[in-house]
């Protein structure tokens, strides 16, 4: 009986030694080997009309659009575009990044003026699109719908 126990113990230790001597392969690193990380995407925390009473606007007036955004990577510029009714999208402004950190919202803030075209019919929809562009070329877009009253 003692001989069997010693034999089993010896086999157990020998098996453990064989398994620990085997080469351990790294986990599959396909993703790491085949993806180039170029940076992080900017974040748009909010895009609203200021003061925030309504999205109904008068033709011929100027509307202040409040953009709240941030990014872990350096920001290059902010593009503002508009689509009036069924027309083509047009660039309203391109603004170079200027640091404007807000302690209240913990984001950068930017007020973008938008002159609403005069002579628009009541009920015309205006879609505003803002795009934050990082220096690493990654972008984030969001839209805001306005209605002519």
PLM feature spans:
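Bacterial Sec-dependent N-terminal signal peptides
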Residues: 2-6, 15-44
């Amino acid at each position: 009986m003692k001989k069997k126990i010693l034999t089993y113990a010896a086999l157990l230790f020998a098996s453990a030694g064989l398994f620990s001597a085997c080469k351990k392969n790294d986990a599959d690193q396909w993703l790491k080997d085949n993806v180039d990380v170029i940076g992080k995407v900017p974040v748009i925390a909010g895009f609203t009309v200021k003061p925030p009473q309504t999205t109904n606007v008068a033709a011929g007036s100027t509307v202040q659009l409040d953009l709240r955004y941030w990014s872990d990577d350096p920001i290059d510029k902010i593009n503002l575009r508009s689509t009036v009714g069924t027309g083509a999208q047009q660039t309203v402004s391109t603004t170079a990044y200027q640091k404007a950190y807000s302690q209240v919202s913990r984001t950068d803030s930017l007020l973008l003026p938008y002159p609403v075209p005069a002579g628009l019919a009541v009920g015309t929809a205006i879609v505003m699109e803002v795009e934050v562009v990082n220096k690493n070329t990654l972008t984030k877009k969001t839209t805001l719908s306005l209605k002519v009253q």
